[in-house]
């Protein structure tokens, strides 16, 4: 089964995708995690994405689509997947069609603006492995330190206070 989860940043797409992924035994494909992994491993697309990510800008559709094509071609996606954060634009949606990807269900998560602000302003991400935390709802065991790899947790560059407000 191929699913898409839509919603504003902080709506809970990643949280819900994780639950569904475990229940259906299909991978959660997060655009953000894919991009961070491509940057970390220094792939061709990762090198291209790094400059945009470092400045807090959105990565171009061509780069995101290229990374997604590579990801859904992997063996663990043969029985389905959950797209979390993709598509974000008409060209990205058209790319799914052009790839011949059949989407079985699209779920959109609606959350009030005030809740979104509260969720996003408390989010933290590990500099090392990309694990996500929230200072109120899902804190790390030691404040500012990733439970998984021990690296520092930070506010994502695309979620600084100005972009939240």
Predicted regions span which residues?
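Glycine-rich phosphate-binding loop of ATP-dependent small-molecule kinases
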Residues: 1-165
């Amino acid at each position: 089964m191929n699913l898409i989860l839509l919603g504003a940043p902080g709506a809970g797409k990643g949280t819900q995708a994780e639950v569904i992924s475990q229940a259906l035994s299909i991978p959660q494909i997060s655009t953000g995690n894919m991009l961070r992994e491509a940057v970390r491993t220094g792939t061709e697309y990762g090198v291209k994405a790094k400059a945009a990510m470092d400045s807090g800008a959105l990565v171009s559709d061509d780069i995101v689509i290229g990374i997604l094509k590579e990801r859904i071609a992997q063996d663990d996606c043969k029985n389905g997947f959950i797209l979390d954060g993709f598509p974000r634009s008409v060209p990205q949606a058209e790319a799914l069609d052009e790839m011949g990807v059949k989407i079985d269900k699209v779920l959109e998560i609606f959350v009030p603006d005030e809740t979104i602000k509260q969720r996003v302003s408390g989010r933290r991400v590990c500099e090392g492995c990309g694990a996500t935390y929230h200072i109120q709802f899902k804190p790390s065991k030691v404040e500012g330190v990733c439970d998984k790899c021990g690296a520092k947790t930070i506010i994502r560059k695309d979620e600084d206070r100005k972009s939240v407000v």
